[in-house]
């Protein structure tokens, strides 16, 4: 597959953009080669600047539940643009989208919009600190909550420790109040509480999507709820990825556990830049101008983004549980086919499906936390990614990302991809 134009475009981009990309994973460093530069997309397919066509399982990293260039969402955006791009003033569209989300998520009594998931999680943590009057937070190895300084933390020694920055440019003092625990390990969380003089909140992806797809266990989620209740700490579900992806009511509906706050993004913007955080009324009342905790944004509640979000959520409501059942059946079909191919070619593989999300690891053992995810064969993943890209299948360019099914996909497309997986694994086996 020729990608001459993409190579030239990438080289040109590197002259004016650091690394040639505006988000590091897009540079293909983990898998090698040149990232395709995308010209256009429709439904389940991307088309690059060389005219190559790819079946897309990245879907802009999750927002596009209905696929690229969905007509209903596009129409809503076009109508909104006619009225103006941005006002910096309240609009009824903000209220409408807030009501749509609140109606579908138990426990979300009030919500505020931001322009990204990073802003949403950053603001939710600030609010939890303001509400509780405490400084420390607990997060988990392998859970990504955006690139705000306090959350760019890696593990020290032991099960749970005060965090160390995992990026240059983040002072130690910025992360000294961030404690790190092991995912799916309640004892490590208890140790964090013991180390702290006061935990404001526990934040996690209830279905982790940034160490590969690793769901929390039911026992773990219920245990966190109990611990937070006992300690007076705010439990925050980061549903930026799993919201309106894992199920009709997100991860909290799957587990039957209601957090005190939740953060959203991706799907609620229908492809436009949107984030949100919401929760109990007494917590949200601490936000300025009602309370003293400050949060703001020039483009927060942007009317074009709100229009896309309203159209997206209303389509989800129209599809209902049947929509999520169909998407999950496609994800299961894809992963079952993948497992059969891996067995045929004697390649170790672990797979996971939750709603319209799927993940796989080239790993001999099941994965339940970040440490286990790191045992995966990343060199094999890189070869597989390259082989699939050559066959016109666009996968996330890291072993530690999640794949997404969209509503424009069907069984015949999934079966086509399974055949390509078989070919790719056979090619890898030949060396």
Curated annotation (Swiss-Prot):
It catalyses: (S)-4-amino-5-oxopentanoate = 5-aminolevulinate. Keywords: Cytoplasm, Isomerase, Porphyrin biosynthesis, Pyridoxal phosphate. Its EC number is 5.4.3.8. The modification N6-(pyridoxal phosphate)lysine is found at residue 266. Its cofactor is pyridoxal 5'-phosphate. It is found in: Cytoplasm. GO terms for biological process: protoporphyrinogen IX biosynthetic process. SUPFAM superfamilies: PLP-dependent transferases (SSF53383). InterPro entries: 4pyrrol_synth_GluAld_NH2Trfase (IPR004639), Aminotrans_3 (IPR005814), Aminotrans_3_PPA_site (IPR049704), PyrdxlP-dep_Trfase (IPR015424), PyrdxlP-dep_Trfase_major (IPR015421), PyrdxlP-dep_Trfase_small (IPR015422). Pathway: Porphyrin-containing compound metabolism; protoporphyrin-IX biosynthesis; 5-aminolevulinate from L-glutamyl-tRNA(Glu): step 2/2. Belongs to the class-III pyridoxal-phosphate-dependent aminotransferase family. HemL subfamily. Homodimer. This is Glutamate-1-semialdehyde 2,1-aminomutase. The gene is hemL.
């Amino acid at each position: 597959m020729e990608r001459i134009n993409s190579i030239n475009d990438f080289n040109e981009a590197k002259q004016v953009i650091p690394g040639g990309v505006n988000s590091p994973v897009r540079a293909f460093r983990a898998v090698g080669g040149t990232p395709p530069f995308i010209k256009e997309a429709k439904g389940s397919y991307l088309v690059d600047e060389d005219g190559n066509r790819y079946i897309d399982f990245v879907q802009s990293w999750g927002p596009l539940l209905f696929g690229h260039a969905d007509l209903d969402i596009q129409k809503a955006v076009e109508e909104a643009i006619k009225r103006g791009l941005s006002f910096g003033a309240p609009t009824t569209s903000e209220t409408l989208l807030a009501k749509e989300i609140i109606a579908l998520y138990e426990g979300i009594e009030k919500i505020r919009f931001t322009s990204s998931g990073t802003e949403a999680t950053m603001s939710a943590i600030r609010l939890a600190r303001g509400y509780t009057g405490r400084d420390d937070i607990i997060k988990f190895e392998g859970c990504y909550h955006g690139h705000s300084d306090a959350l760019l933390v890696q593990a020290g020694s032991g099960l749970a420790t005060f965090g160390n920055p995992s990026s240059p440019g983040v002072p130690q003092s910025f992360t000294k109040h961030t404690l790190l625990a092991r995912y799916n390990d309640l004892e490590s969380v208890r140790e964090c509480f013991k180390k702290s003089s006061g935990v404001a909140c526990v934040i996690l992806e209830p279905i982790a999507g940034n160490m590969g797809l690793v769901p929390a266990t039911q026992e773990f989620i219920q245990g966190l709820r109990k611990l937070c209740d006992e300690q007076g700490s705010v439990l925050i579900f980061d549903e930026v990825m799993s919201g309106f992806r894992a199920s009709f009511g997100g991860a909290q509906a799957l587990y039957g556990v209601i957090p005190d706050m939740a953060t959203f993004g991706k799907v609620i913007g229908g492809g436009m830049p949107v984030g949100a955080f919401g929760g109990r009324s007494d917590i949200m009342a601490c936000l300025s101008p009602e309370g003293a905790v400050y949060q703001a944004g020039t483009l927060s509640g942007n009317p074009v983004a709100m229009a896309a979000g309203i159209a997206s959520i209303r389509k989800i409501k129209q599809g209902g549980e049947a929509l999520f059942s169909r998407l999950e059946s496609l994800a299961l079909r894809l992963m079952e086919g993948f497992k059969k191919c891996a067995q045929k070619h004697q390649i170790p593989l672990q797979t996971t499906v939750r709603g319209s999300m799927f993940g796989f690891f080239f790993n001999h053992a099941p994965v339940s936390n970040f440490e286990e995810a790191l045992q995966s064969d990343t060199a094999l993943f890189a070869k597989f990614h390259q082989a699939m890209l050559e066959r016109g299948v666009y996968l996330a360019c890291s072993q530690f990302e999640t794949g997404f099914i969209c509503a424009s996909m069907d069984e015949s497309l999934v079966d086509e991809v399974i055949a390509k997986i078989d070919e790719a694994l056979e090619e890898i086996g030949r060396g």
